[in-house]
Each structure stands twice: as C-alpha cells, then as structure tokens.
C-alpha cells in the first residue's frame, strides 16, 4: 500500500512538473538584444504635441502657416534571462519632431524651424507568463531618466539660433508583449509611457 502510494505521488509530481519544464527557455539563451520602432509614445508625444499645439495656436493668431513632421520613436534594448519567467535589462529610446513656421499663410518664406528630441534611458524588467520555444507572452515595467532637447532657428531675429534642454523622470508599462522566434525573433508590444504605444521590432538571443 505504501509502495503504491509512493508511486502515485511520484507520478503526480512528474505530471505536475511537465508544464513548468516545458515553459523553461533554452539554458544557453540567456542574453537578448533587439531594436524596435513605432509612431510615438503617449507621454513623449504629449510633451511634443503640447508644444506644437500652442505653437500652432500662436501662428494661427499671427496669420502664419506651419507644418509639423514627426520622426517616430526608435529603441534599442538588452535583457538578461534570470529564470523562465523574469528578465532584467535596459532600454534606450529616442523620438522627436520638426515644425516649420512660415512668414505668411501663402508660405512665401520660412520664418523659423523648431526641432524637439526626447531621449530616455530606463532600466527594465519583464515578466513572462507564457513561455514556449517559439512564442513568449510578457508584460513589463521601465523606470529611468529622460532628456528633452529643443533647437530653434528663427530667421527673423539677429540671433537666429536658440537651444533648450531639460531632464525629467521617465517610465513605461508594457501591457502586452509577444516574441516569436528562437535565436532570432520578431516582437510586438502595447505600451503606456515613454515607449511607443504600438511597437514592432526584431532581435536576437545567445
């Protein structure tokens, strides 16, 4: 009776451990590096968009035309696999815009050009809740520092060039992320913070 009970317990433990073992990634693929791109981040886009909005309002009141071009957001990231469900790493992002202001509504000549760039450097953690050799689903959080750089060329002034910069706390939450691939993979993420709210990317593991 005791022997049968011991065998039954051993069988149960083996069966229970199968999903966990199946979720563990390959032990030799601890490092991950990748790049990503998207249209803009919620907070970075808000900072730049607010500046563009008030600039556009002032230009409208002054009867001057303007045009804005957004560069998009780009990132480079590195992660180290601690165990089958947790990764730690660091993420660097950059996004920006260029606004051209004209002397009149007919765009006869350029009055000024404004450029805004936002850089962030954020330590990051990922939590993988579905881990298979070819597919990983995860969520994550980032917290670090950001830097806003503004450059204006005003052709109507004697001193046409002006610059400004500010540091600020940067953060991000990855609500949903998916990696598809083993040593080389593609990714898709939904973010809220200073990473692109929709992001696509590629990467490699070793």
Placement of each model-derived feature along the sequence:
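Extracellular loop and loop/strand-boundary signature of outer-membrane beta-barrel proteins
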Residues: 60-64, 106-113, 157-164, 185-187
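Short glycine/proline- and aromatic-enriched beta-strand/turn motifs that initiate or cap beta-hairpins
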Residues: 21-80, 203-205
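Outer-membrane beta-barrel translocator domains and adjoining extracellular loop/strand segments
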Residues: 45-53, 100-108, 149-159, 198-203
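Cleavable N-terminal export/targeting peptides
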Residues: 1-30
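Transmembrane beta-strand segments that form the barrel wall of outer-membrane beta-barrel proteins
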Residues: 181-194
């Amino acid at each position: 009776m005791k022997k049968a009970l011991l065998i039954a317990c051993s069988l149960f433990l083996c069966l229970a451990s199968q999903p966990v073992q199946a979720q563990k990634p390959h032990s030799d693929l601890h490092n991950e590096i990748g790049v990503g791109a998207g249209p803009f981040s919620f907070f970075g886009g808000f900072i730049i968009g607010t500046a563009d909005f008030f600039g556009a309002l002032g230009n409208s009141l002054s009867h001057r035309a303007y045009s804005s071009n957004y560069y998009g957001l780009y990132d480079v990231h590195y992660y180290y696999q601690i165990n089958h469900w947790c990764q730690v790493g660091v993420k660097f992002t950059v996004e920006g815009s260029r606004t051209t202001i004209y002397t009149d509504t007919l765009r006869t000549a350029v009055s000024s050009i404004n450029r805004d760039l936002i850089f962030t450097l954020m330590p990051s953690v990922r939590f993988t809740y579905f881990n298979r050799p070819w597919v990983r689903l995860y969520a994550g959080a980032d917290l670090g520092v950001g830097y806003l750089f503004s450059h204006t060329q005003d052709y109507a002034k004697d001193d046409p060039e002006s610059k400004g910069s500010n540091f600020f706390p940067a953060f991000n939450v990855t609500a949903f992320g998916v990696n598809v691939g083993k040593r080389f993979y593609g990714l898709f993420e939904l973010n809220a913070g200073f990473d692109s709210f929709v992001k696509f990317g590629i990467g490699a593991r070793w």
